[in-house]
């Protein structure tokens, strides 16, 4: 008799395969296609678009995330996160604002000296936001999709034959994922991209008007509030936030 962990969960995995498939399209393939089409039609400027993408990659992937990963191995930091949850969430939100808005400001002042129009600001913000979508949501959606497919066809059991406990953990975790949360994750990413465009316009305006510092501070505060609201919602509704 087949007693595999995925037995009886076929319908669940089918729904999740569909949901993760849709998420993978809208958070990985669609952003890439959108940028290619907009550049080809000259609706956006390629240089600010690329700089915006690099601003996110450097500030988050190369700097902030590794620092947080190191801190997460420290007992005092874990204790702080557990005992001071609100302050911990504020810290996460504010550091995202500090790192990303600082990178945005440096990108505009140092690498967009001749490209500071609204079109350039939109291009920069779109690149920043879509890079985040692709790296933090798109890639994980594809990974989860592959896991669900492997669980559905039974190949996951062969892959984890020597690690039944790990297989059980993966199976339980994926079975617990609500398809509603997957779809909400797509909506949340749309709002995040719109925010990145807004924040980029703020930085561009600050640089153009000679008030880069005050506009940068406004962008950091706005970013902190936006992320904090999203993180708090994630605690109660499982909305994805990155």
Predicted regions located by residue number:
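Short, small-residue-biased leader/transition segments that mark boundaries at the very start
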Residues: 2-13
């Amino acid at each position: 008799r087949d007693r595999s962990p995925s037995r009886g969960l076929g319908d669940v995995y089918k729904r999740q395969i569909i949901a993760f498939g849709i998420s993978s399209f809208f958070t990985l393939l669609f952003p890439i296609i959108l940028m290619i089409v907009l550049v080809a039609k000259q609706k956006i400027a390629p240089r600010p678009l690329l700089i915006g993408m690099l601003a996110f990659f450097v500030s988050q992937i190369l700097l902030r995330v590794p620092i947080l990963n190191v801190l997460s191995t420290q007992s005092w930091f874990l204790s702080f996160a557990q005992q001071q949850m609100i302050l911990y969430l504020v810290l996460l939100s504010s550091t995202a604002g500090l790192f990303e808005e600082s990178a945005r400001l440096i990108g505009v002042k140092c690498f967009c000296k001749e490209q500071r129009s609204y079109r350039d600001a939109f291009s920069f913000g779109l690149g920043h936001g879509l890079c985040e979508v692709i790296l933090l949501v798109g890639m994980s959606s594809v990974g989860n999709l592959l896991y669900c497919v492997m669980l559905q066809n039974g190949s996951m059991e062969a892959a984890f034959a020597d690690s039944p406990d790990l297989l059980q953990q993966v199976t339980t975790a994926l079975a617990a994922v609500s398809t509603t949360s997957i779809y909400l994750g797509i909506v949340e990413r749309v709002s995040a991209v719109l925010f990145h465009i807004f924040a980029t316009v703020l930085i561009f305006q600050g640089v153009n008007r000679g008030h880069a510092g005050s506009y940068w501070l406004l962008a950091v505060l706005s970013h902190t509030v936006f992320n904090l609201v999203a993180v708090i919602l994630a605690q109660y509704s499982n909305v994805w936030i990155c």
